[in-house]
Curated annotation (Swiss-Prot), chains A, B, C, D:
Enzyme Commission number(s) of this protein: 4.2.3.5
GO cellular component: cytosol
Protein name: Chorismate synthase
The entry's keywords: Amino-acid biosynthesis, Aromatic amino acid biosynthesis, FAD, Flavoprotein, FMN, Lyase, NADP
Length: 366, 366, 366, 366
């Protein structure tokens, strides 16, 4: 398996390149009988779409999704759901100047060595554009989980470059271009404007959360729920770190502090991030991601060409100066796909899953 | 699949419980013709073994491995290698008092809800004892990778509780009970003695490294090398965070800093941690883990019993006050299993892999 | 996994319905660097295409394939190859009269019970139309195997209803509408004309052969080469029996007859059909299939409706009176996909495969 | 994957060699809470065991199974069930004379070419002895299916060499050494005695049946129920042909005959063998197998040695002159494993399965 399929029971097979004719995916294993239309999927695609603010790539892609199969008379049939998104705004000429050399921090060096060739148009297969089909598939998973268990997914930015973003309220997230949980984002607007002007890029930290997750999801020994979450999150372009619950802070915690006390009305804290022994506890799943700065920048960088000779690389074209900005809806989709897969795996072995244990106290990280 | 198999081509299927008659694994997909004996495996098992210092559990297990199949006249045959380790020092009575209640931070709550029952003897299947077969399988992978590519694995502790451990030299690691890369470990001895006396536990941070890794390993889109590394590492008992290369520090880096420059003699830095676009670059693979404090502690904790009633839990028995101490050889094994699997996947699709790109400059993290 | 992906390393994920907007597949795992164009695939699709003689369905589908991804500058890149075939000649109204009842011998009864709904348009997902993407994927496998090992695939009809078709020569196969290895097909033309007039359908027997197959392909214990061949062949619509080599005739053979003698110049016979112990021997792979008569016939049949009430069913629409007629190119494709997958599996574990053992004597079945 | 794991959700990983220290398997995915003991498994192992009549190999193996894991207080826990069978009656010296040459019709030629070596002791991994762990795993599946759905499995011999065995009654099967459904087996006793005396071997035909199979099992497109049945059956040692329902007889049937009429009280016939469109219909599953004559015979055969030189081979040692005789319980186990896997797959995607449609008329093949 060449790694383009995600999931064991709710399987998403992704295809396409940034500058090819189309991208898309095939979802295999969706339960039959769920109402599904393009509109259900388009909403999340629009949240991820480029060109929506001056802080992201100006490539203009409507990312309109077409359902090719698996839905009959408005309902899923249980057969593969093929989703197609045509590429419409490729400008391959922008990439001509980097076809013979390698961008520092970019996948093109590794692709060249692995396959003996590479598609330099927009990064080809390594482009973050390929997260669009993942988001589309995630929308299907979200809908099923919401209808079946009331599970919800949300994500926000908690740090932009060196600026921490305090958590005020989830309500602010949809109202600013940064997916920031704060009312006033002027500081981040200014930061990004200065960054763009400098020709550089920056990293970001993203928090992802799932609520009303059924208890009992996750397969020990190796396919633990948190292991599979780490897999999808680290596999997202530019991610260099993943935390569950207290994450790296747990290193300096004592056992008497870290272990979340249980009470007759629920857990007293959530250092576990909703997972114990690799299995969901019914608490909120809490994940945090470190996203590195974009490698495609206009500032000149020292590098080599395909013949191993020293050269200088400048990446023109339309790139996100902070890929973390658009990562929130993608991270939600990835978390939904993992939970969906484990929901099906659970009912295969253990029968239908139990609803989230109630009441779960509102103790949350950050 | 219930999650007890790791890998797609070099497949390890793990079985057993902490206090059952035996634990073990079946390795399927090992190339034929490699010399292999129990001694090749025992060395790593001995590094992970309990009872080797006063800072780890005093359970006395020789962890002697028996090869049941897959080796003929001292060589692997290409058929499944079954490895068996008999349990010899179970004391199930130690666990009687916790069979009816849940330990805060422990898997038993989740197992109970998932399966409708649990094996309370030593945590049953959720016990860290089940890492022994993983270490055994990892030893087989290490041997093949060393012979074929010269790949080497090592790990050390970089933080114990709130005490950071500076990096002095890899040579110190085998000479102290903490896998610490320092000459003088008195501070850590004292720290652990005080911790044990207090009846509490602490976390740790572990660094894992692979050198001479062939370039080109890793399968985009979803089964990237770093994604699969994150999967196995987060799946290790008690791990709450995983970083590749610069990890969470990359959030505050600029693109001009983070992206490792390429020069005719190699990369100028290793913020990437040896992976670009999910594919190995030939640089050292660098991984860092956050390990939470042990949940099984002697200090009384607030909890509930299986009927949902309030209770107090004290965990007697023999437990590691810092599970991170024995994590180093396990983390090495997990990294070896991932790289082995991707080496086979690579040669399936692309033919035999290229040796590590040379020369690789000695730039390393930390 | 819902069963729409074939193969473990050369993976084909099939999607679409007979009367939806499109059908297609995603091939994951194709080695990089092979020249590939739509023309390479179209040739086999044209051999399978409906409407090419009066003996097959008169549905007029050009089955024009579009490569959506995985090919750059005329060469495979090692990333997923998505193939799209638009449906152009659906006439859903033809099926209105059977939406409320079940055709004897047809999948619609089983689909109804499995999914709680069904797509009655042309059989939806159960239609033989879904073999088109399989044929397209098989063409890619055939090309790689031919270039790498010189492996070739061919199939012919050996029985039509109760009429055995003697084997004269492979050269005749492309020159008649039955894929029959004989020069004179008048008897079969007459037979089919009479059958159509009677409103009935008939079965067929198909022989499939691969030549110049490398020795050593196949994974014991469970994924033997012949086991995987039986899997794909029995999974082909309407197939009720599969034989390898001597097949059912071997029941009455003695060991002294059945076991193919080995001589310094090759095997003396091929009762094994090219497989011993589940592993290819370098001899020709020989497979035989039993294909049942089409269930969609115009003759009235006793049946029940979806409420369990007695009814009579007549299937109008455009159907193949003998689905076996178009089965030859599909069976070739299926055999190619199995051998391709095992070629990649073999080189993953054992390194690159050995060429077919030469000389292979020309002893062939029937 | 090297092919030693069967199933996608109820996964059986098989290990061991005929003359190694032990054979066994790991079952992953068994639902928790089912009562299980060694006795539940031993019964089927005893039916398959060698040495039970003069017509089978005289190797004396008790085949005593030990449960190493996955069962706690007499119930399955949902974690891997490891089963171990020690080999006790190996006589490796019997095989010394064939280590340097290849037996016609035997796997050793293919193993040699695949792996570059082979284990000549009793055929090593290719030995029919490795069906014992499969039978053990099948016993677990049978128990779960019987308790959950009332599904039952049985198999009998329908032809021995050139002697057809008429079907009288299933009740006779356990009362003769041939698993023959007839009261008087004198003819078969005589046939086998003469065969043994002649130093030759013969084939057999086996019928396998599952009753009370839930409707809706099977995953189109590729993992159809009949496809997966064909996979396991063709993968059984010595099998050269597989039929479902009417099998090869369907070639000469007309559609008006083959398609089983539906009536308000059930199907009027069972040419389909219980599967339509790859999905179970609730009718009995009917399978037929062709088993070739044993290749290990005492009569001298023309062959080559490992240097390609002409030689003569005589196989001493203890072999079954008709491996089909012990195939009945193995075929039952294989069918049970496939149905078990699909039962779990079905409830993953579609929720819990429906009971077998009743009443199913008693129309049965042959």
């Amino acid at each position: 398996m060449s790694g383009n399929t995600l999931g064991t029971l709710f399987c998403v097979t992704n295809f396409g390149e940034s500058h090819g004719p189309a991208i898309g995916c095939v979802i295999d294993g969706c339960p039959p009988g769920m109402e599904l239309s393009e509109a259900d999927i388009q909403a999340d695609l629009d949240r991820r779409r480029p060109g929506t603010s001056r802080h992201v790539t100006q490539r203009n892609e409507p990312d309109a999704v077409e359902i090719l199969s698996g839905v009959y008379e408005g309902k899923t049939t249980g057969t593969p759901i093929a989703l197609l998104i045509r590429n419409t705004d490729q400008r391959s000429k922008d990439y001509g100047n980097i076809a013979q050399s390698f961008r520092p921090g970019h996948a093109d060096y590794a692709y060249w060595h692995k396959y003996g060739l590479r598609d330099p148009r927009g990064g080809g297969r390594s482009s973050a554009r390929l997260t669009a089909p993942t988001v589309a598939a995630g929308a299907v998973a979200k809908k099923w989980l919401a209808e079946k268990y009331g599970t919800r997914f949300r994500a926000c930015m908690t740090q932009l470059g060196e600026l921490p973003i305090p958590f005020e309220n989830w309500e602010h997230v949809p109202h600013n271009p940064f997916f920031a949980p704060v009312a006033d984002v002027q500081a981040y607007e200014d930061y990004m404007d200065a960054l763009r002007k400098s020709g550089d890029s920056c990293g970001a930290r993203i928090r992802v959360q799932a609520t009303s997750v059924p208890v009992g999801l996750g397969e020990p020994l190796y396919d633990k729920l948190d292991a599979d979450i780490a897999h999808v999150m680290m596999g997202l372009n530019a991610v260099k770190g993943v935390e569950i619950g207290a994450g790296f802070a747990s290193v300096a915690q004592r056992g008497t502090t870290h272990g979340d006390s249980l009470t007759p009305t629920g857990f007293a804290s959530n250092n576990a991030g909703g997972v114990l022994g690799g299995i969901s506890t019914g608490q909120d799943i809490e994940v945090s991601l470190a996203i590195k700065p974009t490698s495609s920048i206009i500032s000149p960088r020292e590098s080599i060409d395909i013949h191993g000779q020293s050269t200088e690389v400048i990446t023109k074209g339309r790139h996100d100066p902070c890929v973390g900005i658009r990562a929130a809806p993608i991270a939600e989709a990835l978390l939904a796909l993992v939970i969906m897969d484990h929901a099906l795996r659970h009912r295969a072995q253990c029968g239908d899953v139990v609803q989230a244990v109630a009441p779960i106290p509102a103790v949350r990280l950050g």
